[in-house]
Amino acid sequence: MGHAAQAWERLSGMLTDADVSAIPELYTPDALYLEPYNPPHRGNLLIQAYLKDWLGGKDEVQVASLRVIESEDGKALGVEWTMSYTAAGRRWNDLPRASFFGFADDGRIDYHRDYT
């Protein structure tokens, strides 16, 4: 497993634990996060705040990686994954997701796009 795939493991672990306190270490200060339902999130601190808010109200979060594809140079990563969680008394199971990442020279995420 290369560096980019390890970054995904860290991020998916943060989602599962609902603890995004280490996001500033994982993303660059000017990172761009794009997802379908909101305007772009720019910067590691705004990404952290968004993910913290997004995880609020979700319990028993589970992330399953179905396919992880890392570029040979470790600068890009594609992940097909599912997410399950409980919210408002209802269980949501195996919601399909796809994420694409770009990495800066220092190994941190500088680009993240999610599809649902």
Question: Language model features by range: what are they?
Answer:
Residues 62-64, 78-80, 93-99:
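Short, surface-exposed coil-to-beta transition loops
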